[in-house]
Amino acid sequence: MLIGEKGVGRRSLVHALGFAPPAGLCPLAVEYAGPFVLPPAEFMENRRFYRALITSAMECRTLVFVQDATRATSAFPPGFARTFNQRVLGLITKPDSPRANTARAGRFLASAGLQAIHTVNILEGAESAAMKEFAREIF
């Protein structure tokens, strides 16, 4: 399951790994694309939907918190990873942007309770070394 705010690159990541998420607008329903589960970004952005997010995560083996390196804030509250009884990984996207601050994004994910944090540039595609390492970690 890929969890993150709107625009962090969750759907692009799934597409880069060779699985096509459903086309169209981002719905307010959980989407399935191959082995990936994509809950709506609103589940993360609105605390009222945390129960739905936790319930959706019950069927998943691995959760991935996706943080955009260009954002100055994070939607992940401190210690949020401890809410789940699954393996939780962190993923920093958009590290090549001029406004990127991967150290800050790493601090956000560490604050959420993650130890395993990967940085990938989705635009490089599935053949990049970072993307291959991340794919090995989640599968």
Show where each model-derived region lies.
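Conserved G1/Walker A P-loop phosphate-binding module
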Residues: 1-39, 44
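Charged, alpha-helix-enriched surfaces in structured cytosolic catalytic cores
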Residues: 8, 12, 48, 100, ...
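Short amphipathic alpha-helical segments
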Residues: 14-15, 76-79, 102-104
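Signal for well-folded cores of large energy- and translation-related assemblies
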Residues: 18, 22, 54, 58, ...
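N-terminal secretory/membrane-targeting helices
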Residues: 19-23, 53, 63-65, 103, ...
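Switch II of P-loop NTPase G domains
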Residues: 36-82, 99
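Conserved beta-strand/loop subsegment of P-loop NTPase cores
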Residues: 60-67, 84-98, 109-121
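Canonical P-loop GTPase G-domain recognition
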Residues: 97-139
